[in-house]
């Protein structure tokens, strides 16, 4: 599962909103497929510009991500690096493109079900559900850190108090 962070949550939410509001969608088009919509949000490139960059590599986003090399500055590699900076791994990119992350599917409203990668409504619900799941994970991490910090502070104070007696 992707690393929970505000940037990724916002990208998923904005991409879902764009799709809901009628943005062009075509699963077979690098610039207007699932990852293409995330890239439109984070890069501010349009679908045509993303397609031009993506055509410097071969395959779908899944293959491009697997072959990604951070050293080259090929246009497709720059796009994959944007996705990785959001907290996505090649597996996450594959799951976004194919709507296959089991954690997201189990978190769907109404429970687990398979979604179709090329159905706009399925992409919207997947993006929104993934954003909600990441938001919950991020919230849990923040609460856990605060709790650990509080417990550490309390134990430090108790130790200091014990030395006085």
Show which residues each predicted segment covers.
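Cysteine-nucleophile amide-bond enzymes
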Residues: 1-29, 33-36, 40-165
């Amino acid at each position: 599962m992707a690393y929970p962070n505000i940037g990724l949550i916002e990208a998923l939410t904005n991409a879902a909103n764009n799709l809901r509001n009628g943005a062009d969608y075509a699963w077979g088009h690098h610039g207007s497929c699932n990852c293409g919509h995330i890239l439109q949000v984070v890069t501010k490139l349009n679908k045509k510009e993303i397609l031009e960059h993506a055509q410097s590599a071969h395959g779908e986003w899944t293959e491009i991500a697997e072959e990604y090399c951070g050293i080259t500055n090929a246009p497709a590699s720059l796009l994959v690096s944007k996705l990785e900076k959001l907290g996505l791994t090649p597996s996450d990119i594959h799951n976004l493109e194919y709507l296959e992350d089991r954690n997201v599917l189990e978190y769907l409203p109404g429970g687990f079900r398979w979604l179709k990668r090329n159905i706009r409504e399925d992409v919207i619900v997947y993006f929104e559900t993934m954003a909600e799941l990441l938001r919950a994970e991020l919230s849990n991490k923040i609460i856990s850190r605060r709790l650990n910090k509080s417990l550490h502070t309390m134990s430090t104070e108790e130790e200091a108090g014990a030395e006085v007696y």
